[in-house]
């Protein structure tokens, strides 16, 4: 999330200048050398495997004057026949010159044969009688035999020893030899200009304060131990993806004056049994040698999953061995003081309970998505090195990015810089940031995607329906922008609602209004064209989810009552899950209640669009002409929002310059009335409509009861 990076230090190097490492030969060179040695060894074996004939045939060849020369050795008689003489042995396959040069014994000439010697004192006389040239050859000594057999193996073992020495020094194959050693990177004595500090972490004030206390404990332990306090053994960072858990750990590495070991949870798991536990032991051994220090395990759920879940039947899960060793190292008989374990995960629900108990992870710090102030601080951090135009309003950008995590804000800021560079601007303007946010939220704009006029008209009325319902119901968030320009994978248009403030609670009326806003597109198509299309698929999915949550999770149904079927141990952190704890009759009742809520919302939307049909037509025509409308342009067509508060507080700038730039600068207040979630201003018409909807809902329930 920041441009700074951490560089592992080498604590074993005390020289002022780092020596240049020796060049490492590729592993293929060693393979070639081994192959050559094996070839030489085979040559020794093949050198003695010449063509052999019986001794009687040898004497016959002498008497028939077919022998040219003879070399007599103690172990063999080597005979050279005259050219053209057939030895009676089968022909050999032809070899090439390279083979004969590399392996001279691989192929014996056709006129050379061997004979096993026998005790024959008349052999020399027979050779002299027939004029055969002969000579003696001394036999091989035991030393030469020893060299012939031992030297190749000595060369092989020497090469083997050399390669494994290279492996131990970090050469080729070192990973195989060091498979039981941990892969943690050590950060120590980091450079002032490259390290990440707590100043680079924004929007995480509470989490940062908790972690800073741990760092301060390591720097000045007496400050805390004087009253009997103990050093915490573990800190678990929990939060959705992209919120800055790893960045917070990098800041700890940059701020702490103690060694910092960093490793990923997946680095403990290998294909070999016992490697994970060995790496855990080696990691804590090194950490204890450098205590006090910090160990950071990123994505600890890769190794810390609950035991017994996901294990193969009939086998021992390697992850369990690794986890058991981790539990022992964190709080077992052989634990030492001075080693703090930090870990990060976005799946705390799958972690083993023994890992989460106090004494191992004493603190669980929630790293959540930033609020309005946190988003503004995060924008400030990620734009501090950018050239910004004076019209850039970071507070307005923060208000336009509700629910953004730190990584998404960093991505939006980077996209804005790229857009400004693509447009050849000298600085990044507010328009660039708004386009970048829109690109992150809705996807890449597809200007070249051709839509036929009929479908374009359907999309225009669909988005206009969303906008009018959201605009006329003050419980909904204000409509910031409407577009019928295709974006992303499949979106043909979208309506962007921007909340005026961060909300943590929603009332039943607000959820009902949100369902109405989502139904606005489908009902508008039905009212104008007399038929519906597939464009409302995503809207219907959201409507179904909200309605079922109202009935099953939040207890907002009179028939179901104050019951919740919420399942906290869901497989995906942060997403509500539902576990079936009811029978078929209750399931039927739930479905009826959900359908009643959605049908009541649909009737409310039909009445509203019928009342504002002229505004629907005007908004759709303007969309077909301009393809994109901002807040001020929408306000010109639909008028002031009923019960809206942003106009009264001066939070919307509808000046001519702002309208020309196509942007609206929302600057919502960070404080809100404590009762704002319960009391919402309603017009008489809206109140009557909601009361009528409630009456229809009650009537439908009475009918179902009967």
From Swiss-Prot:
The lineage of its organism: Bacteria, Pseudomonadati, Chlorobiota, Chlorobiia, Chlorobiales. It is found in: Cell inner membrane. SMART domains: AAA. It comes from Chlorobium luteolum (strain DSM 273 / BCRC 81028 / 2530). Its cofactor is Zn(2+). The chain crosses the membrane at residues 25-45, 143-163. This is ATP-dependent zinc metalloprotease FtsH. Residues 46-142 are periplasmic. NCBIfam families: FtsH_fam.
């Amino acid at each position: 999330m920041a441009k700074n990076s951490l560089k592992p230090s080498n604590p074993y190097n005390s020289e002022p200048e780092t020596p240049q490492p020796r060049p490492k030969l590729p592993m293929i060179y060693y393979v070639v050398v081994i192959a050559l040695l094996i070839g030489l060894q085979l040559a020794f074996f093949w050198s003695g495997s010449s063509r052999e004939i019986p001794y009687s045939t040898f004497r016959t060849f002498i008497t028939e004057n077919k022998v040219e020369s003879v070399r007599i050795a103690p172990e063999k008689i080597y005979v050279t026949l005259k050219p053209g003489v057939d030895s009676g042995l089968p022909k050999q396959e032809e070899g090439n010159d390279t083979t004969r040069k590399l392996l001279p014994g691989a192929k014996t000439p056709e006129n050379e044969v061997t004979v096993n010697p026998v005790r024959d004192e008349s052999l020399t006389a027979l050779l002299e009688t027939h004029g055969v040239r002969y000579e003696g050859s001394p036999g091989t000594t035991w030393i030469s035999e020893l060299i012939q057999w031992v030297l190749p193996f000595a060369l092989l073992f020497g090469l083997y020893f050399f390669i494994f020495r290279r492996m131990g020094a970090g050469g080729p194959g070192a990973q195989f030899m060091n498979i039981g050693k941990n892969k943690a990177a050590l950060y120590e004595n980091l450079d002032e200009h490259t390290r990440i500090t707590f100043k680079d972490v924004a929007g995480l004030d509470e989490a940062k304060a908790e972690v800073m206390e741990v760092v301060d404990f390591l720097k000045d332990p007496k400050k805390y131990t004087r009253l009997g306090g103990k050093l915490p053994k573990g800190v678990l960072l929990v939060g959705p993806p992209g919120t800055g858990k790893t960045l917070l750990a990098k800041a700890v590495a940059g701020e702490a004056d103690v060694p910092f070991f960093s490793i990923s949870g997946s680095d403990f798991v290998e294909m070999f049994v016992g490697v994970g536990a060995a790496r855990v032991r080696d990691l804590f051994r090194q950490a204890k040698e450098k205590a006090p220090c910090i160990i950071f395990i990123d994505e600890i759920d890769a190794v810390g999953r609950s035991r017994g879940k996901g294990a193969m039947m009939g086998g021992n899960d390697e992850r369990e061995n690794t986890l058991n060793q981790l539990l022992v190292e964190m709080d077992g008989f052989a634990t030492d003081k001075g080693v703090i374990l930090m870990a990060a995960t976005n799946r705390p629900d799958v972690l083993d309970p023994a890992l989460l108990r106090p004494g191992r992870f004493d603190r669980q710090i929630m790293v959540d998505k930033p609020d309005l102030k946190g988003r503004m601080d995060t924008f400030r951090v990620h734009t501090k090195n950018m050239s910004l135009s004076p019209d850039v309003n970071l507070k307005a950008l923060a208000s336009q990015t509700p629910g953004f995590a730190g990584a998404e804000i960093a991505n939006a800021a980077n996209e804005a810089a790229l857009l400004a560079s693509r447009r050849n601007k000298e600085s990044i303007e507010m328009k660039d940031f708004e386009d970048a946010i829109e690109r992150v939220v809705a996807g890449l704009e597809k200007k070249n995607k051709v839509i036929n006029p009929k479908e374009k008209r359907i999309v225009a009325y669909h988005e206009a329906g969303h906008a009018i319902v959201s605009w006329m119901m003050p419980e909904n968030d204000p409509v910031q922008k409407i577009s019928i320009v295709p974006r992303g994978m499949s979106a043909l248009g979208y309506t962007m609602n921007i909340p005026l403030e961060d909300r943590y609670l929603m009332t039943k009326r607000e959820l009902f209004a949100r369902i109405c806003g989502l139904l606005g597109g489908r009902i508008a198509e039905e009212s104008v064209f007399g038929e519906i299309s597939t464009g409302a698929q995503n809207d219907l999915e959201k409507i179904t989810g909200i309605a079922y949550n109202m009935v099953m999770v939040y207890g907002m149904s009179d028939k179901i009552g104050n019951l919740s079927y919420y399942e906290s141990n869901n497989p995906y952190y942060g997403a509500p899950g539902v576990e079936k704890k009811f029978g078929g009759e209750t399931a039927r009742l739930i479905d009826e209640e959900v359908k009643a809520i959605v049908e009541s919302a649909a009737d409310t939307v039909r009445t509203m669009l019928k009342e504002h049909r002229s505004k629907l037509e005007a908004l759709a025509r303007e969309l077909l002409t301009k393809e994109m409308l901002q807040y001020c342009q929408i306000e010109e067509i639909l008028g002031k929002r009923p019960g809206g508060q942003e106009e009264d507080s001066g939070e919307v700038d509808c000046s001519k310059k702002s309208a020309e730039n196509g942007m609206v600068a929302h600057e919502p207040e960070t404080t809100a009335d404590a009762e704002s979630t319960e009391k919402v201003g309603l017009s008489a018409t809206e109140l009557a409509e909601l009361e009528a909807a409630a009456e229809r809902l009650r009537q439908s329930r009475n009918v179902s009861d009967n």
